[in-house]
Amino acid sequence: MNNLLLVALGGSIGAVFRYLISIFMIQVFGSSFPFGTLLVNVLGSFLMGVIYALGQMSHISPELKALIGIGLLGALTTFSTFSNETLLLLQEGDWLKATLNVVLNLSLCLFMVYLGQQLVFSRI
């Protein structure tokens, strides 16, 4: 299958997952903090680490990288939404939540990419 179609398919799946996860997190935790965006970014970062590590070991096809790594995870995770939500918190004067949002997204996402890679590398 054409890689462009795989990216589009993965992107549509990732966007739907992001929407459903965000709605679920608002229902569970309310909307005072962007937990949905945090969760999709952390989960997506972990999966990106796994995909990257598998790709480094040639255990994943270029087609699967396009479908999952670029399409699904590209649509699932969202830096633009993270940035907008952080700016809204700042504009509301909630510096603590804005700072927490930045620190949690960056530190947890970096850690999850690392964890995903280590999980794969330790199994081989």
Swiss-Prot record:
The keyword Transmembrane applies. Coiled coil: none annotated. It is found in: Cell inner membrane. GO terms for molecular function: fluoride channel activity; metal ion binding. Fluoride-specific ion channel. Important for reducing fluoride concentration in the cell, thus reducing its toxicity. Belongs to the fluoride channel Fluc/FEX (TC 1.A.43) family. This is Fluoride-specific ion channel FluC. The lineage of its organism: Bacteria, Pseudomonadati, Pseudomonadota, Gammaproteobacteria, Alteromonadales. The gene is fluC.
